[in-house]
Amino acid sequence: MADRAHRLKKRAEFLKVASRGRKVPSPGLVLQALGRDDSDPARIGFTVTKKVGNAVVRNRTRRRLREAVRVVEREEPLNGVDLVLIGRDGTRGRTFAALVGDLRRTLRKAGVRGAE
């Protein structure tokens, strides 16, 4: 996740994860995970709908999700998986520690290696 090369950018990539991957909801976010057949670093995409708020609020939510991923990845790198993190309205009001806890729980439930 350290560089932009490991991000999902294209709509087709997001749709592939959404249709074939596992969806795990939590109060702060929704995680969609799709395993890959390699051990390359995780490719991660972030999305926040307009339902959450205006552009300023959505971008802040996206930044908080990105930082939560960085915190989790520092402990143990995520490999061989494509992830999509969807910001919810509840993301805004949660403390950062609660958001990181939500991410850890959803990764564990999705069975992502490196999240145990």
From Swiss-Prot:
Protein name as it appears in the record: Ribonuclease P protein component
Substrates-to-products reaction catalysed: Endonucleolytic cleavage of RNA, removing 5'-extranucleotides from tRNA precursor
SUPFAM superfamilies assigned: Ribosomal protein S5 domain 2-like
Enzyme Commission number(s): 3.1.26.5
Protein's GO biological process: tRNA 5'-leader removal
NCBIfam families registered for this protein in UniProt: rnpA
A GO cellular component entry from the record: ribonuclease P complex
UniProt key word tRNA processing: yes
Keywords attached to this entry: Endonuclease, Hydrolase, Nuclease, RNA-binding, tRNA processing
Pfam families assigned to the protein according to its UniProt record, in alphabetical order: Ribonuclease_P
Domain of life: Bacteria
HAMAP family: RNase_P
Record family assignment: Belongs to the RnpA family.
Quaternary structure annotation from Swiss-Prot or TrEMBL: Consists of a catalytic RNA component (M1 or rnpB) and a protein subunit.
GO MF term set: 3'-tRNA processing endoribonuclease activity; ribonuclease P activity; tRNA binding
The protein's enzyme class: hydrolase
Role according to the record: RNaseP catalyzes the removal of the 5'-leader sequence from pre-tRNA to produce the mature 5'-terminus. It can also cleave other RNA substrates such as 4.5S RNA. The protein component plays an auxiliary but essential role in vivo by binding to the 5'-leader sequence and broadening the substrate specificity of the ribozyme.
